[in-house]
């Protein structure tokens, strides 16, 4: 979004991913005369950020289970968002019942669909608590109380928006394509030349170190960040199309979430048939999970040992938050 809008405006942006109070304040303070501020905001910080910045547009991504010891359940976060969005203009996903419930309270909605199916936490209606009805193989949802999936203003099919605009994305994975599409829609809302915006979006090769390359020993690693079951599902699907060798690095610090029970919500079967190494502060937890899944793997002390084992080859590192940023800044 920042790069798309930068083609027309001067931008203040927390480009390092520092999305809590201090990071937002630092981004605004670093460029106080910017014409537009593009701020990535933590789930719990969103109500505060809306109150303090009075945004012209709030872009809501999907809302999944993440750091339950810090964020609480998805429904609680959705309710907090709903309370904060009164009077706001939002770009929101129609595919996520919790986002729809929150965005329904906004003054104006721009609905976006990537035709995603189902939601691992949405068995019941966020509005009334009754069982949510899922139809069309998970593509649509509705409830007897009247809550339902809204019609989308923008629909992404593959790389094409509304069967008209092909969106550029140089970052692999379905989530990256969806974010590129959202950036395109935001550029349209802010009156940016769409051809210039689309080119700028396509020029983004890595975001805050994600998908950046890091050479350790003789191994060329690609860095992938995964923080919760939803992001692990997406990352594992993306990684499956890449190198056969993969290193998993999982910590459990405050920024990661100290509760690692989420590992049991992740389907690790995409790792089958690959050379898998495991390290990090919670490597034993990960090893236990992979053993139950039947995934062959080895536990190693750190990424240097992993590089010695992998040798001169390409490999992926899939890392939790603190491990990822340590490696990205190494």
Question: Model features per residue range: what roles?
Answer:
Residues 126-129, 140-147, 188-192, 199-208, ...:
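ATP-dependent carboxylate-amine ligase
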Residues 39, 92-94, 178, 223, ...:
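Active-site flanking residues adjacent to catalytic metal/cofactor-binding acidic residues
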Residues 23, 48-49, 69-70, 100-103, ...:
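Short glycine-/acidic-enriched loop or helix-start segments at secondary-structure transitions
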Residues 64-219, 296:
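Acidic, Mg2+-coordinating active-site environments of NTP-dependent enzymes
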Residues 5, 24-28, 180-190, 235:
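Buried hydrophobic packing segments
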């Amino acid at each position: 979004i920042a790069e798309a809008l930068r083609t027309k405006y001067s931008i203040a942006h927390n480009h390092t991913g520092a999305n809590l109070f201090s990071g937002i304040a630092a981004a605004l303070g670093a460029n106080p005369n910017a014409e537009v501020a593009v701020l990535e905001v933590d789930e719990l910080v969103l109500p505060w950020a809306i109150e303090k910045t009075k945004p012209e547009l709030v872009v809501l991504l999907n809302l999944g289970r993440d750091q339950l010891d810090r964020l609480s359940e998805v429904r609680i976060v959705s309710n907090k968002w709903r309370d904060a969005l009164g009077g706001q203009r939002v770009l929101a996903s129609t595919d996520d019942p919790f986002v729809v419930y929150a965005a329904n309270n906004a003054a104006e909605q721009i609905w976006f669909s990537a035709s995603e199916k189902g939601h691992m936490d949405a068995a019941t209606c966020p509005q009334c608590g009754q069982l949510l009805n899922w139809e069309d193989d998970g593509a649509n949802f509705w409830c007897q109380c009247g809550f339902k999936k809204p019609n989308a203003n923008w629909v992404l099919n593959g790389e094409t928006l509304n069967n008209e605009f092909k969106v550029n994305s140089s970052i692999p994975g379905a989530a990256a394509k969806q974010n590129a599409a959202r950036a395109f829609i935001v550029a349209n809302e802010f009156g940016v030349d769409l051809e210039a915006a689309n080119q700028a979006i396509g020029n983004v090769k890595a975001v805050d170190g994600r998908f950046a390359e890091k050479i350790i020993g003789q191994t060329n690693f690609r860095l992938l960040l995964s923080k919760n079951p939803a992001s692990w599902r997406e990352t594992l699907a993306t990684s499956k199309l890449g190198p056969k060798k993969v290193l998993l690095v999982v910590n459990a610090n405050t920024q990661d979430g100290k509760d690692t029970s989420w590992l049991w919500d992740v389907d690790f079967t995409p790792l089958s048939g690959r050379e898998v190494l495991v390290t990090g502060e919670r490597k034993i937890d990960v090893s236990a999970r992979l053993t139950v899944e039947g995934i062959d793997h080895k536990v190693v002390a750190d990424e240097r040992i992993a590089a010695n084992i992998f040798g001169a080859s390409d490999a992926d590192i899939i890392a939790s938050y603190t491990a990822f940023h340590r490696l990205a800044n190494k």
